[in-house]
Amino acid sequence: MTLTLAMVTCDTPDPKGLASWWAAQVGGDVVDPFDGSYVMVVAGPVRLAFQVDEAPTPGKNRLHLDLTATDLDAEVDRLLAAGAGLVARRGDENFRWVTLTDPAGNEFCVASAAEAEADL
């Protein structure tokens, strides 16, 4: 295979603000090499990037992040306190996840790490 996933980019009217929020959530560093028009979060092998778009595409996300947490309930509480919005709590006793939105309205999901790894 010749492709390597390097970055996931999100359009937003506020790249710096959204990058700062995500960096605080995933423990990454904000890198701003283009004076605020394209801002990256470095927090592991795949970077998150945020680029200026004054009119993001309306409607449901066609792509979203799936994250895992060792303590799902505590992590969801922390994200909500940090400004995430709750969309839905989903799943059953075998696999639970929560769909949230970041401050710009982009959906993402958080699942229990142990349950997610058991399903792989």
Residue ranges and their predicted role:
Residues 2-12, 32, 40-42, 46-51, 55-79, 96-101, ...:
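Vicinal oxygen chelate
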Residues 14-29, 75-81:
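Amphipathic alpha-helical segments
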Residues 36:
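Short, Lys/Arg-rich nucleic-acid/phosphate-binding segment
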